[in-house]
Amino acid sequence: TCKQKGEGCSLDVECCSSSCKPGGPLFDFDC
């Protein structure tokens, strides 16, 4: 389940599992 900011994700990106990943293809990082 993906979550948005304010639902367990510290960044303004979708938070899938335990990782926050921006919607773009150039980034891939954890919270």
Curated annotation (Swiss-Prot):
GO terms for cellular component: extracellular region. Disulfide bonds join C2-C16, C9-C20, C15-C31. It comes from Conus cancellatus. The keyword Disulfide bond applies. This is Gamma-conotoxin-like As7a. The presence of a 'disulfide through disulfide knot' structurally defines this protein as a knottin. Gamma-conotoxins may act on voltage-gated non-specific cation pacemaker channels (HCN). Elicits toxic effects in the freshwater snail Pomacea paludosa after intramuscular injection, but it has no effect when injected intracerebrally into mice. The keyword Disulfide bond applies. Keywords: Disulfide bond, Gamma-carboxyglutamic acid, Ion channel impairing toxin, Knottin, Neurotoxin, Secreted, Toxin. Belongs to the conotoxin O1 superfamily. The modification 4-carboxyglutamate is found at E14. It is found in: Secreted.
